[in-house]
Amino acid sequence: MNRTYLINAIDSIATADGYSFYTDGEERMSEQIKSYPAAWLQPPKFQQMEGRKHGKVTYDVTLHVMEAEAKLSPAERQQTWSRLEDELIEIFSKLSDATLVIAVEDLKIRHTSSTLTTHGEVAATATAEVVTFF
Protein backbone atom coordinates (compact mmCIF):
# COMPACT_ATOMS: atom_id res chain seq x y z
CA MET A 1 0.00 0.00 0.00
CA ASN A 2 2.73 2.51 0.92
CA ARG A 3 4.64 1.76 -2.27
CA THR A 4 1.56 2.42 -4.43
CA TYR A 5 0.78 5.58 -2.44
CA LEU A 6 4.35 6.81 -2.92
CA ILE A 7 4.28 6.22 -6.69
CA ASN A 8 0.89 7.94 -7.01
CA ALA A 9 2.04 10.90 -4.89
CA ILE A 10 5.13 11.46 -7.02
CA ASP A 11 3.02 11.06 -10.17
CA SER A 12 0.55 13.71 -8.96
CA ILE A 13 3.28 16.17 -7.98
CA ALA A 14 5.32 15.74 -11.17
CA THR A 15 2.24 15.93 -13.40
CA ALA A 16 1.03 19.09 -11.63
CA ASP A 17 4.49 20.58 -12.25
CA GLY A 18 4.13 19.96 -15.99
CA TYR A 19 6.02 16.69 -16.41
CA SER A 20 4.89 13.64 -18.35
CA PHE A 21 5.24 10.92 -15.70
CA TYR A 22 6.58 7.42 -16.32
CA THR A 23 7.64 4.61 -14.03
CA ASP A 24 9.48 1.41 -14.89
CA GLY A 25 13.02 0.07 -15.04
CA GLU A 26 15.62 2.33 -16.67
CA GLU A 27 16.11 -0.07 -19.58
CA ARG A 28 12.66 0.89 -20.90
CA MET A 29 13.09 4.68 -20.93
CA SER A 30 13.75 5.13 -24.64
CA GLU A 31 10.74 3.12 -25.74
CA GLN A 32 8.25 4.54 -23.24
CA ILE A 33 8.98 8.27 -23.05
CA LYS A 34 6.80 10.02 -25.61
CA SER A 35 6.96 13.68 -24.56
CA TYR A 36 9.12 16.14 -22.63
CA PRO A 37 9.61 17.42 -20.04
CA ALA A 38 9.54 13.94 -18.54
CA ALA A 39 9.83 12.53 -15.03
CA TRP A 40 10.94 8.89 -14.79
CA LEU A 41 10.54 7.12 -11.46
CA GLN A 42 12.43 3.90 -11.01
CA PRO A 43 10.41 1.42 -8.95
CA PRO A 44 10.91 2.40 -5.28
CA LYS A 45 13.12 -0.06 -3.41
CA PHE A 46 11.94 -1.29 -0.02
CA GLN A 47 14.79 -0.51 2.36
CA GLN A 48 13.51 -1.24 5.85
CA MET A 49 10.48 -1.49 8.08
CA GLU A 50 10.04 -0.67 11.75
CA GLY A 51 7.00 -1.82 13.72
CA ARG A 52 4.41 -4.54 13.26
CA LYS A 53 0.87 -3.17 13.10
CA HIS A 54 1.93 0.47 13.02
CA GLY A 55 5.31 1.82 12.10
CA LYS A 56 7.57 3.11 9.36
CA VAL A 57 8.61 1.85 5.95
CA THR A 58 11.61 3.43 4.23
CA TYR A 59 12.04 3.35 0.45
CA ASP A 60 15.00 4.27 -1.72
CA VAL A 61 13.61 6.51 -4.45
CA THR A 62 15.31 7.49 -7.72
CA LEU A 63 13.65 10.10 -9.92
CA HIS A 64 15.02 11.35 -13.25
CA VAL A 65 13.75 14.60 -14.74
CA MET A 66 14.50 15.30 -18.38
CA GLU A 67 14.14 18.16 -20.79
CA ALA A 68 14.35 17.82 -24.58
CA GLU A 69 17.24 19.28 -26.59
CA ALA A 70 20.58 17.72 -25.86
CA LYS A 71 22.20 20.04 -28.42
CA LEU A 72 22.34 23.07 -26.18
CA SER A 73 25.30 25.36 -25.72
CA PRO A 74 27.30 24.76 -22.54
CA ALA A 75 25.74 27.87 -20.95
CA GLU A 76 22.20 26.77 -21.86
CA ARG A 77 22.91 23.27 -20.54
CA GLN A 78 24.08 24.73 -17.21
CA GLN A 79 20.92 26.84 -16.97
CA THR A 80 18.76 23.79 -17.72
CA TRP A 81 20.55 21.69 -15.09
CA SER A 82 20.09 24.48 -12.55
CA ARG A 83 16.36 24.66 -13.31
CA LEU A 84 15.96 20.87 -13.17
CA GLU A 85 17.77 20.82 -9.83
CA ASP A 86 15.40 23.46 -8.44
CA GLU A 87 12.41 21.50 -9.74
CA LEU A 88 13.65 18.25 -8.16
CA ILE A 89 14.04 20.02 -4.83
CA GLU A 90 10.49 21.33 -5.19
CA ILE A 91 9.09 17.88 -6.06
CA PHE A 92 10.71 16.26 -3.02
CA SER A 93 9.69 19.18 -0.77
CA LYS A 94 6.08 18.70 -1.85
CA LEU A 95 6.44 14.94 -1.35
CA SER A 96 7.51 15.53 2.25
CA ASP A 97 4.09 17.13 2.82
CA ALA A 98 2.17 14.11 1.47
CA THR A 99 -0.17 12.35 3.89
CA LEU A 100 1.72 9.09 4.49
CA VAL A 101 5.21 10.59 4.19
CA ILE A 102 7.08 11.24 7.42
CA ALA A 103 10.29 12.55 5.87
CA VAL A 104 12.46 12.80 2.79
CA GLU A 105 16.05 12.18 3.85
CA ASP A 106 19.48 12.18 2.24
CA LEU A 107 18.35 13.89 -0.98
CA LYS A 108 21.12 13.87 -3.58
CA ILE A 109 20.95 15.35 -7.06
CA ARG A 110 23.37 14.66 -9.87
CA HIS A 111 23.49 15.87 -13.44
CA THR A 112 24.22 13.55 -16.32
CA SER A 113 26.59 14.63 -19.07
CA SER A 114 25.25 11.96 -21.41
CA THR A 115 21.63 11.32 -22.31
CA LEU A 116 19.55 8.67 -20.55
CA THR A 117 17.60 7.77 -23.70
CA THR A 118 18.20 7.66 -27.43
CA HIS A 119 16.09 10.83 -27.83
CA GLY A 120 18.70 13.33 -26.72
CA GLU A 121 17.81 15.23 -23.56
CA VAL A 122 19.25 17.07 -20.61
CA ALA A 123 18.69 15.14 -17.40
CA ALA A 124 19.12 15.38 -13.66
CA THR A 125 18.67 12.52 -11.21
CA ALA A 126 17.57 12.69 -7.58
CA THR A 127 17.94 9.91 -5.05
CA ALA A 128 16.45 10.00 -1.57
CA GLU A 129 15.25 7.88 1.29
CA VAL A 130 11.52 8.41 1.75
CA VAL A 131 10.13 7.41 5.14
CA THR A 132 6.42 6.55 5.18
CA PHE A 133 4.16 5.37 7.97
CA PHE A 134 1.54 2.66 8.15
Question: Residue spans of the language-model regions?
Answer:
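A short, hydrophobic beta-strand-centered structural micro-motif
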Residues: 34-45
